[in-house]
Amino acid sequence: MALKTFELRKQSQENLAEQLQELRQELASLRVQKIAGGSGSKLSKIKTTRKDIARILTVINESNRLAAREAYKNKKYIPLDLRQKKTRAIRRALTPYEQSRKTLKQIKKERYFPLRKYALKA
């Protein structure tokens, strides 16, 4: 029977690593039996074992990434694989702060020649 992911998430890292080792050994023995000419039920068990290994690795990687995110939460620089995935154009675009900056000449021009407002008499 296949493992349930929600049950795997409750387990500790050591327990998951131990389970992963057992499944890998089981997969190796199933592959040997396949070469030796095992029955059909053994061959179908290879698929479920591979999927179970993938589930365990997914849960382990998920928890590792979550721990890394917590570690880098308030840091200035975050590793590339933990950063938010954006398009290349968005990553290279100016930040709101950079967009709002003005040159000294522009500041003086706005100060000394403000936009004139006109009221129309109806």
Swiss-Prot record:
Localization annotation: Cytoplasm; Nucleus, Nucleolus
Keywords: Cytoplasm, Nucleus, Phosphoprotein, Ribonucleoprotein, Ribosomal protein
One GO cellular component term noted in the UniProt record for this chain: cytosolic large ribosomal subunit
Highest taxon above the source species: Eukaryota
InterPro entries: Ribosomal_uL29, Ribosomal_uL29_CS, Ribosomal_uL29_euk, Ribosomal_uL29_sf
Signal peptide: none
GO MF entry, a single one: mRNA binding
Presence of keyword Cytoplasm: yes
GO BP term, example: maturation of LSU-rRNA from tricistronic rRNA transcript (SSU-rRNA, 5.8S rRNA, LSU-rRNA)
Record carries keyword Cytoplasm: yes
Record text on subunit structure and interactions: Component of the large ribosomal subunit (LSU). Mature yeast ribosomes consist of a small (40S) and a large (60S) subunit. The 40S small subunit contains 1 molecule of ribosomal RNA (18S rRNA) and at least 33 different proteins. The large 60S subunit contains 3 rRNA molecules (25S, 5.8S and 5S rRNA) and at least 46 different proteins. uL29 is associated with the polypeptide exit tunnel.
Reported function: Component of the ribosome, a large ribonucleoprotein complex responsible for the synthesis of proteins in the cell. The small ribosomal subunit (SSU) binds messenger RNAs (mRNAs) and translates the encoded message by selecting cognate aminoacyl-transfer RNA (tRNA) molecules. The large subunit (LSU) contains the ribosomal catalytic site termed the peptidyl transferase center (PTC), which catalyzes the formation of peptide bonds, thereby polymerizing the amino acids delivered by tRNAs into a polypeptide chain.
Family affiliation: Belongs to the universal ribosomal protein uL29 family.
Matching HAMAP family: Ribosomal_uL29
Protein name: Large ribosomal subunit protein uL29
Source species: Schizosaccharomyces pombe (strain 972 / ATCC 24843)
Gene: rpl35
